[in-house]
């Protein structure tokens, strides 16, 4: 399995990752948090405690929670080991890193975004 770093996160599959809207041009969306259950070219769909929320990528900043080997201490710039805003969150004992990504970096079809970031001897 490839380790996800702050630099490589925009090229990876986001489905299944826990995400939180850290900032948004629409203040009503700030703080929405949940698991990524779908992604389109321009939106991220999060399953939250109260249902499903579709958040436009443009104008949003997302904070992704990465666990275990993806949270290695050498992840570098852009990785925090505490969430932005200082609130605490419980985990099940695994290593956790929080990676903040501008939604503009995610604007594209998910399959194209991941294809373009991967070196392949077949292309």
Curated annotation (Swiss-Prot):
Residues 73-93 are annotated as: Disordered. SMART domains: POP4. InterPro entries: RNase_P/MRP_Rpp29_sf, RNP1, Rof/RNase_P-like, Rpp29/RNP1. It comes from the Archaea. Keywords: Cytoplasm, Endonuclease, Hydrolase, Nuclease, tRNA processing. GO terms for molecular function: ribonuclease P activity; RNA binding. It holds the Pfam family RNase_P-MRP_p29. SUPFAM superfamilies: Rof/RNase P subunit-like. It is found in: Cytoplasm. One of its GO terms (biological process) is tRNA 5'-leader removal. Its EC number is 3.1.26.5. It is an enzyme of class 3 (hydrolase). It catalyses: Endonucleolytic cleavage of RNA, removing 5'-extranucleotides from tRNA precursor. One of its GO terms (cellular component) is ribonuclease P complex. Belongs to the eukaryotic/archaeal RNase P protein component 1 family. Part of ribonuclease P, a protein complex that generates mature tRNA molecules by cleaving their 5'-ends. Consists of a catalytic RNA component and at least 4-5 protein subunits. This is Ribonuclease P protein component 1. It comes from Halobacterium salinarum (strain ATCC 700922 / JCM 11081 / NRC-1).
């Amino acid at each position: 399995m490839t380790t996800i770093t702050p630099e490589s996160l925009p090229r990876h599959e986001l489905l299944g990752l826990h995400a939180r809207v850290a900032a948004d041009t629409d203040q009503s969306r700030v703080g929405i948090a949940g698991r990524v259950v779908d992604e389109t070219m321009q939106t991220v769909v999060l399953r939250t405690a109260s249902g499903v929320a579709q958040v436009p990528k443009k104008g949003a900043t997302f904070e992704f929670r990465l666990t275990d080997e993806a949270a290695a201490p050498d992840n570098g710039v852009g990785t925090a080991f505490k969430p932005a805003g200082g609130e605490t969150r419980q985990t099940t004992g695994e290593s956790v890193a929080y990676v903040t990504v501008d939604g503009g970096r995610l604007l594209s079809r998910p399959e194209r975004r991941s294809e373009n970031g991967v070196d392949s001897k077949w292309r």
